[in-house]
């Protein structure tokens, strides 16, 4: 069984502090015993001194388990099919307090599209955010547990995501997988939103950007939004062959 634990991070003072803390608890409560390789992915901003700073924060007996890998320069390039101006106009509306930047959205895409090539050659991989903390000792090897139970994916939490942030997701999947509508129906919660409220004005503007005038959704006072139930994937373990199907 070939395994690895992956981080994706940036070389800023705040993120380095988070990463050091995460690594401390990773080894204290799990990996000093089970000794899985730890791979820190970055966009080329971790020079020798920065890498050394991180390595010296890890207990000496475990430093050899930690390595750094620079991402391909094109990994975070905006795809050609995306209209940059339209995207920037949508982001500028800030429809919710946690409306995300273009870089954050590219990061989400990276985990789905590009991460598998860095996980190639491993049977199972774990993802941790650089601010993830394993708070208590784990008295069993998570990878062995994962393999024993013949799992494809495991996370520590399910949550209901924002219906505004995920607008159009349910319809997209139903159009792409018409024979899975019943299953998809169980994966989303309906929300009725009052479209006359002044707080919904940014979302109304978003709809006008996303849809041609003759394709605008019809609503009198409210609109149904669909919130997906999804894994909180700041922590997960997965079988790499699942993503190669």
Residue ranges of predicted features:
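N-proximal low-complexity "stem/linker" segments adjacent to membrane-targeting elements
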Residues: 1-24
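Active-site-proximal specificity loops/subdomain of glycosyltransferases
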Residues: 57-121
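Short beta-strand-to-loop acidic/aromatic patch adjacent to the donor-nucleotide binding site
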Residues: 120-135
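Short, charged/polar "capping" segments at the starts of alpha-helices
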Residues: 15, 44-52
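Short beta-strand/loop segment that forms part of the nucleotide-sugar
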Residues: 36-44, 69-75
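Conserved catalytic core of nucleotide-sugar-dependent glycosyltransferases
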Residues: 90-104, 108, 116, 132-245
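Short, acidic, metal-binding catalytic loop of nucleotide-sugar glycosyltransferases
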Residues: 24-35, 57
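Short loop->beta transition adjacent to catalytic acidic/histidine clusters or analogous donor-positioning motifs
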Residues: 3, 31-39, 63-66
């Amino acid at each position: 069984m070939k395994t690895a634990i992956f981080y994706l991070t940036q070389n800023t003072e705040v993120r380095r502090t988070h990463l050091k803390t995460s690594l401390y608890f990773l080894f204290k409560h799990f990996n000093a015993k089970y000794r899985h390789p730890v791979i820190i992915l970055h966009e080329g901003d971790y020079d020798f001194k920065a890498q050394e700073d991180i390595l010296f924060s890890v207990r000496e007996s475990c430093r050899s388990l930690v390595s750094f890998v620079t991402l391909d320069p094109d990994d975070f390039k905006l795809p050609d099919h995306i209209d940059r101006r339209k995207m920037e106009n949508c982001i500028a509306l800030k429809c919710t307090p946690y409306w995300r930047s273009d870089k954050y959205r590219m990061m989400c895409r990276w985990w789905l599209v590009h991460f598998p090539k860095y996980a190639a050659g491993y049977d199972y991989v774990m993802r941790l955010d650089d601010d993830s903390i394993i708070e208590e000792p784990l008295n069993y090897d998570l990878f062995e547990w994962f393999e024993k139970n013949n799992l494809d994916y495991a996370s520590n939490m399910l949550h209901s995501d924002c219906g505004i942030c995920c607008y159009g997701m349910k319809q997209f999947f139903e159009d792409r997988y018409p024979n899975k509508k019943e299953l998809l129906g169980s994966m989303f919660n309906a929300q009725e939103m009052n479209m006359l409220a002044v707080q919904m004005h940014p979302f109304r503007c978003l709809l006008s950007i996303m849809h041609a005038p003759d394709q605008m959704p019809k609503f009198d006072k409210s609109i149904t939004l669909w919130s997906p139930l999804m894994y909180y994937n700041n922590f997960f373990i997965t079988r790499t062959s699942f993503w190669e199907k």
